[in-house]
Amino acid sequence: KEKLEFTPLTEDELLITVDCQYGAGNVTKLPASNVAVIDHHQLEIEKLPLMFMDASCGSCSTIVWRLLLQEGFDANRDEELATALYYGLYTDTNQLGEIYNPYDKDMRDELQFDQSIVTRLKNSNFSLSELEIAGIALIRCIYNEANRYAVVKAEPCDPNILGMISDLM
């Protein structure tokens, strides 16, 4: 896999935050002069010039889908994108049980997604014992602030649990 490298933003670049708000408590505030926010939660920050917010939507996926449509891009041209958008709606709306916004309904009905991937994602839950392994490993991690690395020791477990631990570091 290709290693992703952090490149500081310059004046000509754009930082886009999705499903969160730049400067809110759940976002690390990177220095950026051009920031766009795409979110479906209640407004927590001062309004920005590039802000696409709709708290009536059940999912941020719906707002992304609408922005794509407005730009003339049909998400169904890319089945993986359509699947990701659908699964975002699925998870944010309690398995589609809390869909009230007409745009959410339109997206649900119009996306042509890969049902086998959605089924696989729906069935990829962690057991309590696996979550306990991850939790203990994270609580007991050793972090070297000077050199910016962490050492985590976990009990023997499924590689997916190790991946989750790594993602949370």
Label the predicted regions:
Residues K1, I45-L168:
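A structured phosphate/pyrophosphate-recognition subdomain
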Residues E2-L50:
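Active-site cofactor/cluster-binding pocket
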